[in-house]
Amino acid sequence: MADGTRHWQRLLLTGAAGEIGSVLRPALAGTATAIRLQDLRPVAGLAPQEEAMQGDLAEPGIAEAAMAGVDCVIHLAGIPREAGGDPDAIFRANVLGTHLMFSAARAAGVKRFIFASSNHTIGFHPAGRPVGTEERPRPSGFYGASKVYGETLGRLHADKFGMEVACLRIGAFRTKPGNARELGGWISHRDMAQLARRCVEASDFHFLVIYGVSANRRALWGGDAAARAAVGYVPEDDAEVFATEIEGIAPPPGSVAARFHGGGVCEAGFSGDPDRIR
């Protein structure tokens, strides 16, 4: 394009009927000649450039059909939270589904794959200091572990197969933060839309990990300045404007939720010894 941004022939957005997908749809207008919207549920209200596809990406053949003619992917589909700690359900949707998506993308010659990862990939790092993108994974639970797998698979596809891969460790995606922890980990709808579009339109890159958070002055995570610059992500919102409403909403001092970055997700079902976690 004349302004230097990338333009794609067909962009695939999975999980398009979900909370994040519904926000991204209007933000992605004009980034591709056609935008394919995939979800388990029907996708309504199609714009002229949009096309819909319904199906379960963990079922045989669905990922391949979704990838037909696609050159850029935003993969949001999957179970978006701990799902009651059901590892089998999370494995099927988030591990098997993501594996099939990367395999289908590779076979179809997809150039760029943007993967919705999570801050819960690093949840069992002790709270009190920011966690960078190069530190080892310490997932909060089965959901976080599934996202670690997705990031690892993305790294493999970038290094071995030359696919451009961006992993977005999305924080608390809400209209406004709901507790004190989210004063550092919140991402606004506006900033999430900007981040996705920047990743789609950016010039060539290899492999990036970016924390999907707003410009929160109480930032919990960091080390991604170069990756943000590579795509041009400059968040505009700051959770601090909500601080007086929610900074008192916090777990008891010394609790598992207070001691680790993953908060309540780390605490749910916890039966270990927190003093042994360094």
How would you describe each model-predicted region?
Residues 8-30:
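N-terminal Rossmann NAD(P)H-binding glycine-rich loop of SDR-like oxidoreductase domains
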Residues 44, 50, 55-93:
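NAD(P)H-binding glycine-rich loop region in Rossmannoid oxidoreductase-like domains
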Residues 100-138:
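Conserved Rossmann-fold NAD(P)-dependent oxidoreductase catalytic core, especially the SDR/UDP-sugar
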Residues 208-210, 217-234, 238, 245-275:
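Conserved C-terminal active-site "lid" loop/helix of NAD(P)H-dependent oxidoreductases
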